[in-house]
Swiss-Prot record:
May catalyze the ATP-dependent phosphorylation of lipids other than diacylglycerol (DAG). In fact, is not able to exhibit diacylglycerol kinase activity in vitro. ATP binds at N9, P10, T11, S12, G13, T40, G66, D67, G68, T69, V70, N71, E72, T93. This is Putative lipid kinase SP_1045. Its cofactor is Mg(2+). GO terms for biological process: phospholipid biosynthetic process. NCBIfam families: YegS/Rv2252/BmrU family lipid kinase. Keywords: ATP-binding, Kinase, Lipid biosynthesis, Lipid metabolism, Magnesium, Metal-binding, Nucleotide-binding, Phospholipid biosynthesis, Phospholipid metabolism, Transferase. Binds 1 Mg(2+) ion per subunit. This ion appears to have a structural role and is required for catalytic activity. Residues 1-131 form the DAGKc domain. InterPro entries: ATP-NAD_kinase_N (IPR017438), Diacylglycerol/lipid_kinase (IPR005218), Diacylglycerol_kinase_cat_dom (IPR001206), Lipid_Phosphate_FormReg (IPR050187), NAD/diacylglycerol_kinase_sf (IPR016064), YegS/DAGK_C (IPR045540). Mg(2+) binds at D212, Y214.
Length: 294
């Protein structure tokens, strides 16, 4: 008997997630003979539900929530020998993972388009004990770029990136950082560190195809507004690695430390202070989505 567990964060979708409960259950019942729904009430509920689904060998877990809820679910299924397939309905603010997978950002559309015959294996990152499906970062520039609205990008193009960058530079500072990997190290000043599990950033392809179990590490060495603005044209051209202000390393095992107390971020949510050890778990989770064309 095919079984699926639906996990819903009730605060998702502008706190209207439960309005979609019946529709999501009916969608799952088109494919699975048994569907059980769990509603989160507090932090880590999604992890515990996902652990149960893995332990009971459910065929799939379908989660309705933002990146934080999705990463809780990934944490729950990854800690087990059996990993159910994963469905994601975007219900958060950033929804970085579903955007990466090109899942419809409209809730009704995402449910309608959920195809349980179509899957895509993705890499997962683990930073200490925190999981992420897209990006680990230190510094405010990633948030500035993520927060550019699609409508603004369409209307104003590069100007929108520039305005958000100038806003972020006001609070930035350079810190001493040490990045250690199996493919090289970086020791020196930096204003931002990004660890990407994909070849895309801010909707732009900046690396070659990246389904190889490696993370792309970008270190912005200068906090000045001129350095940040110089990155934008290269980002839009998909050639950010060539920028003189960027240090680039590709690796699977990463340790980041600093002599300052620096906070990190995973998929838009606050994470541990440094030091952090990151491992890339290659092709770890099978997600219901169409394969992304490179």
């Amino acid at each position: 008997m095919k079984k699926a567990m639906v996990i819903i964060n009730p605060t998702s979708g502008g706190e209207k997630a439960l309005d979609y409960k019946e529709k999501l259950e009916n969608k799952a019942k088109e494919y699975f003979e048994y569907v059980e729904t769990k509603i989160t009430e507090k932090a880590l509920d999604a992890t515990h539900f996902a652990e149960e689904a893995s332990r009971e060998q459910y065929d799939a877990v379908v989660v309705f929530g933002g990146d934080g809820t999705v990463n809780e679910v990934i944490s729950g299924i990854d800690e087990r020998d059996y990993i159910p397939k994963l469905g994601i309905i975007p219900g958060g603010t950033g929804n970085l993972i579903t955007k990466l997978l090109e899942i419809n950002q409209d809730i009704d559309g995402a449910i309608d388009e959920l195809d349980f015959d179509l899957t895509n294996k993705i890499d997962i990152g683990k930073a200490n004990d925190n999981y992420f499906g897209y990006i680990f970062s230190i510094g405010s520039l990633p948030e500035a770029i993520h927060n550019v609205e699609i409508e603004d990008k369409t209307k104003f193009g590069i100007l929108t990136y520039a305005v958000n960058t100038m806003k972020s530079v006001m609070t930035d500072q350079v810190f001493n950082i040490k990045v250690e990997t199996e493919n090289g190290n970086y020791v020196g000043e930096a204003s931002h560190v990004l660890v990407l599990l994909t070849n895309y950033f801010a909707d732009k392809k900046i690396f070659e195809e990246n389904k190889d179990g490696y993370a792309n590490i970008l270190i912005l060495k200068d906090a000045s507004i001129f350095s940040k603005l110089s990155v934008i044209p290269d980002l839009l051209k998909g050639d950010v690695v060539a920028n003189d202000n960027i240090e680039y390393i590709k690796a699977r095992n990463i340790k980041i430390s600093s002599d300052s107390e620096l906070e990190s971020d995973v998929d838009g949510d606050k994470s541990d202070n440094l030091p952090v050890e990151i491992k890339v778990l290659a092709q770890r989770v099978e997600v219901f989505s169409k394969p992304k064309e490179d």
